[in-house]
């Protein structure tokens, strides 16, 4: 194998020690990863066409009851422990409102339209007066304050049923929800999951996934007792388009929990 030195601009002589460099490339030969601290900067920066990094995270400050609960802000309210997947079978416009009149800045929603294609919508809050958007939503994967101020009160997003489908906790500026739906035309590859239980009590935290038209089932999890755990998959877990992902916990009441996971979306084309 011929080797060329950039600094001296010449090929190495025969018999010179040979070095090899390994890199990961996509099907078109584009480098998509190397090793080291800067390995995924091109991916995070959006420089790789057809590849998207997704980081999801959620927190639950006080579980209600001892049954399963999705790790999201809504789970702190009685009756909202599990994310209401049955209530979002039909797509609809959404209504956004705060419980504090001081919230009059913009909220941006990210999620999927009626065809499960990615879309965004920015809605200007009018405090405690509900505002209805114009786009139709099948899933909302994220909500965040995109104006000039962080939210003072709790921001609630409801669909047409009306059911709470996303919340932004007061003074957080971003939804805290450990669930996600893979967009149409993409495949998700799960690299890492982090789970934390802060209280001195036992809890089971598990990731559930539901392929389109299928049922939720556990794809990974852990038992914790005032500890944290990170799972790094040597071979990523594959999620097909329109798969719903939901990180849930079960254990004693008033648990304080958090979870996060990282996906790489790859265009199916």
Residue ranges and their predicted role:
Residues 2-9, 34-139, 146-269:
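Beta-strand-centric surfaces of beta-sandwich/beta-rich domains
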């Amino acid at each position: 194998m011929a080797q060329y030195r950039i600094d001296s601009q010449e090929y190495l002589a025969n018999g010179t020690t040979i070095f090899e460099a390994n890199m990961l490339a996509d099907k078109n030969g584009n480098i998509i990863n190397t090793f080291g601290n800067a390995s995924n900067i091109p991916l995070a920066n959006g420089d790789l066409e057809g590849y998207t990094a997704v980081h999801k995270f959620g927190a639950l400050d006080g579980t209600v009851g001892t049954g399963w609960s999705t790790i999201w802000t809504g789970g702190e309210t009685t009756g909202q422990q599990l994310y209401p997947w049955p209530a979002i079978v039909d797509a609809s416009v959404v209504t956004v409102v705060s419980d504090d009149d001081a919230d009059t800045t913009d909220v941006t929603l990210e999620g999927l339209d009626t065809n499960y294609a990615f879309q965004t919508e920015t809605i200007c809050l009018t405090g405690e007066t509900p505002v209805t958007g114009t786009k139709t939503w099948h899933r909302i994967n994220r909500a965040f304050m995109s104006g000039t101020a962080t939210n003072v009160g709790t921001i609630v997003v409801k669909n047409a049923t009306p059911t709470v489908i996303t919340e932004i906790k007061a003074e957080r500026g971003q939804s805290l929800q450990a669930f996600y739906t893979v967009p149409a035309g993409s495949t998700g590859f799960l690299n890492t999951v982090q789970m934390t239980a802060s209280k001195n009590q036992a809890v089971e935290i598990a990731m559930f996934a539901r392929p389109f038209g299928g049922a939720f089932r556990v794809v990974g999890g852990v038992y914790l007792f005032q500890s944290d755990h990170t799972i790094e998959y040597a071979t990523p877990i594959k999620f097909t388009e329109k798969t719903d992902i939901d990180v849930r916990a079960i254990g004693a009441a008033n648990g304080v929990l958090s979870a996060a996971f990282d996906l790489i979306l790859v265009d199916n084309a």
